[in-house]
Structures are given as C-alpha cells and as structure tokens.
Amino acid sequence: MIKLRLKRYGKKRNATYRIVAMNNTDRRDGRALEELGFYDPIHNEVRLKEEAIKRRLAQGAQPTDTVRRLFVKANLLPETAQK
C-alpha cells in the first residue's frame, strides 16, 4: 500500500519535512517513490505539487493523519476527510 507521509530532514531540533509517496513497509527516511511537497513547521511554510498529489490520491494512496491535515488546509481534501 502506498502512503503519503513525511520524511524528516534538517538539523537536530530544527526539522523540516518532505511530503513523499512511499510503500507503507519502508523506513521513514528510506527511498521515496516520489516527492510531493515540503513542510517546515518552524516557519509554517508548506509547498505542494498539487497535480502529483491528486494523481497519487486517485491511484489509492492513503495520507497519514499529519499529511491529511496539511492537505485539508491547502483545500486538496474536504474537511470531512479528517478523522
């Protein structure tokens, strides 16, 4: 199963994340199938590749809870998609 999840980058206590499509059995920082965006929680910056995200969601990829919240804020998913 393909998951849309966060992959950690950055320094200690100064993390940034890339939003990636990965197999759900792969390690968090393992090899990604595709990079779909960027998230910096410290500066509250989000960059998304909307077409690629929509394509992955149409293929049946499941976002994690944190990624789902980012997509709802960016209006890529409806509010009811949140748990």
From Swiss-Prot:
One GO cellular component term: cytoplasm
Alphabetic keyword roster: Ribonucleoprotein, Ribosomal protein
Database matches in PROSITE patterns: RIBOSOMAL_S16
Pfam family, one: Ribosomal_S16
Gene3D superfamilies xref list: 3.30.1320.10
Any one GO biological process: translation
Top-level division of the source organism's lineage: Bacteria
The keyword Ribosomal protein is assigned to this record: yes
GO MF annotation terms: structural constituent of ribosome
Entries under InterPro entries matching the protein: Ribosomal_bS16, Ribosomal_bS16_CS, Ribosomal_bS16_dom_sf
Family the UniProt entry places it in: Belongs to the bacterial ribosomal protein bS16 family.
Protein name: Small ribosomal subunit protein bS16
Gene name of this polypeptide: rpsP
